[in-house]
Swiss-Prot record:
Residues 5-119 form the MaoC-like domain. This is (R)-specific enoyl-CoA hydratase. Homodimer. Pfam families: MaoC_dehydratas. It catalyses: a (3R)-3-hydroxyacyl-CoA = a (2E)-enoyl-CoA + H2O. Transmembrane segments: none annotated. Catalyzes the hydration of trans-2-enoyl-CoA with a chain-length of 4-6 carbon atoms, forming the corresponding (3R)-3-hydroxyacyl-CoA. Changing residue 32 to A: Almost no activity. The lineage of its organism: Bacteria, Pseudomonadati, Pseudomonadota, Gammaproteobacteria, Aeromonadales. One of its GO terms (cellular component) is fatty acid synthase complex. InterPro entries: Fatty_acid_synthase, HotDog_dom_sf, MaoC-like_dom, UPF0336/Enoyl-CoA_hydratase. One of its GO terms (biological process) is fatty acid biosynthetic process. It comes from the Bacteria. A (3R)-3-hydroxyacyl-CoA binds at residues 32-37, 55, 84.
Amino acid sequence: MSAQSLEVGQKARLSKRFGAAEVAAFAALSEDFNPLHLDPAFAATTAFERPIVHGMLLASLFSGLLGQQLPGKGSIYLGQSLSFKLPVFVGDEVTAEVEVTALREDKPIATLTTRIFTQGGALAVTGEAVVKLP
């Protein structure tokens, strides 16, 4: 999507369910073997009571949205802030959303709000991405 066709307020979304296999694969790739994500017996002893999805695995959905949908192919991820508000449990479905909030006039750069919602609609992750447009 070109800079000329982007508008403030445009959104893109995708939904995904992260099961135990995806969480284990991410643990292996990231070297984050925290038992809070992988061990139901350990997680049962915590405030969460069951395994939670890695926050960065959730945030990886933003990369897919930005690179494939909005702005799309050829865009370059320049930065991302994140705030983790609620846990997402292994096996739960989430919806990731990006929304264009600003477009620079002097350069092909967009700022987007990034959010992940739980299957119940609560805000689990929020942040802001800066992307160079193709």
